[in-house]
Design a protein with these regions (language model features):
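C-terminal motif of bacterial Sec signal peptides marking the signal peptidase cleavage site
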Residues: 21-24
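N-terminal targeting sequences that direct proteins away from the cytosol to non-cytosolic compartments
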Residues: 192-198, 230, 249-254
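Long, compositionally biased low-complexity segments
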Residues: 163, 238, 243-250, 255-256
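A contiguous, mid-protein "functional segment" used to position or interact
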Residues: 179-220
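One face of beta-strands
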Residues: 37-41, 169-175, 184-188
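Tryptophan-anchored aromatic micro-motifs
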Residues: 26-74, 81-85, 204-214, 219-231, ...
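Predominantly extracellular/secreted and cell-surface proteins with exposed
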Residues: 56-171, 177-179
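Bacterial N-terminal signal peptides that target proteins for export
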Residues: 1-13
Length: 256
């Protein structure tokens, strides 16, 4: 019986063959998601707007936002999630702090905003969009010398850059913020994870320390670990002197 002669491929030929096979396979897109935990959010007033005060009376300039992505439940099936749909929850530190205080919490309103992604997968620009979200608000009663306040967050056009390398760690959106009779509109950029860049001067006062945003550790300077921020974003991250958080100086091209 004759045997078929098989010529062994050279290592170079094997590599060429492997590349040819892999290039013919489409990589699946990641699911729409958001970094789990806090985002450092910078609020920029839109043209023609007047700044509104934050809860403590200072101009609102930014804060930490909690974002969470989940699959809603299927209709009529309380214990089964629907993988064909995805939703996003946003909770500001301001309303979160109020909601966890038993003396201040407003049971009549939700402290978080909720909206649905347009799709469970990013679009052709690797962007996941949540066009509209429910309003988040809390009413704080007057207590002692403190006046009553009503704070409201209305989010729209929230977009996250989602790729294998950047799994929902950069976001932008529009915010309409109300504090009592003051309402203002802001453009928002957010970066995950939220990292404080608050250092101290010789008198113990909080000051901006840009080194705390560096993703590379520097044990000699007392930084045993890096910031945890993606090193690829280093050129677009800075310590904001107003909110003392490491923030995006510019969103990625996909979110502009």
């Amino acid at each position: 019986m004759k045997r078929l002669a098989v010529s062994p491929l050279s290592p170079a030929a094997l590599i060429v063959a492997l590349v040819a096979v892999l290039s013919g396979c489409d990589q699946p897109k990641p699911r729409c998601t958001a970094g789990v935990g806090g985002f450092a959010a910078k609020y920029t007033l839109k043209p023609g707007q007047q700044a509104c005060p934050d809860r403590h009376g200072d101009p609102l300039q930014g804060e930490i936002l909690g974002l969470s992505r989940y699959n809603p439940l299927r209709g009529g099936e309380d214990d089964v999630q629907d993988p064909t749909k995805a939703s996003l929850v946003i909770l500001s530190q301001t309303l979160g702090d109020i909601a966890v205080d038993p003396l201040l919490k407003d049971e009549a309103h939700e402290p978080h905003s909720l909206g649905n992604f347009v799709s469970t997968e990013p679009d052709e620009d690797d962007v996941c969009t949540v066009p509209t979200l429910s309003a988040a608000e809390q009413e704080v009663p007057a207590m002692g010398a403190s006046e009553a306040i009503h704070i409201k967050y209305e989010w729209s056009n929230v977009r996250l850059h989602v790729t294998a390398a950047y799994p929902g760690t950069q976001m932008v959106g529009d915010l309409t913020y109300t504090n009592n009779d003051c309402t203002a509109s802001y453009s928002v950029t957010g970066l995950w994870p939220a990292v404080s860049c608050a250092g101290k001067d010789a008198n113990g006062n909080a000051v901006a320390d840009p080194a705390l945003c560096d993703p590379v550790a520097d044990p000699a300077a007392g930084r045993a670990t890096g910031s945890g921020i993606n090193p690829d974003l280093k050129e677009r991250v800075a310590c904001d002197p107003d909110i003392l958080l490491c923030v995006l100086t510019a969103p990625p091209d996909a979110l502009k």
